[in-house]
């Protein structure tokens, strides 16, 4: 993750969701995130992500993310994106040395879990109760920064 390659924008998140390929799916997940962490900030991020792909991601909660090499970067606690064939959530929080996506992988439903990422075809395949539990956990172990003024 190069801090120059993916940046927050001032684009309207609601308009982005409304114009997406599957606004219903994004609205379901957006509501779940905002319900679990009331008052969390939402920002649309755009840029070239890992692997060289151009992406747009709704970022929830501002955090300062340490990196193994180089300075820490401004990032988001939760990321939500619609890919070509699936949806993805990035949970940028860890507990006991493991990303929370790995802690909850077995209980999340029909998903594919990477280090911090969770991929699935539809919110119907995701256990929203377990997602809610994981989001609460994320806010406890990696509290988002105060909203920007």
Language-model features, listed with the residues they occupy:
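Charge-dense, helix-prone N-terminal extensions
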Residues: 1-149
């Amino acid at each position: 993750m190069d801090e120059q390659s993916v940046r927050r924008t001032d684009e309207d998140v609601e308009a982005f969701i409304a114009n997406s390929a599957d606004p219903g799916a994004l609205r379901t997940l957006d509501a779940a995130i905002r319900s679990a962490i009331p008052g969390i900030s939402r920002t649309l991020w755009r840029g070239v992500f890992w692997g060289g792909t151009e992406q747009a991601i709704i970022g929830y909660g501002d955090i300062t993310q340490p990196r193994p090499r180089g300075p820490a970067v401004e990032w988001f606690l939760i990321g939500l994106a619609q890919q070509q064939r699936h949806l993805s959530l990035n949970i940028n929080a860890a507990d006991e040395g493991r990303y929370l996506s790995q802690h909850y992988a077995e209980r999340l439903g029909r998903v594919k879990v990477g280090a911090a990422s969770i991929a699935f075809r539809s919110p119907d395949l995701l256990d929203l109760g377990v997602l809610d539990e994981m989001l609460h956990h994320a806010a406890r172990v990696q509290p988002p920064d105060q909203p920007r003024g």
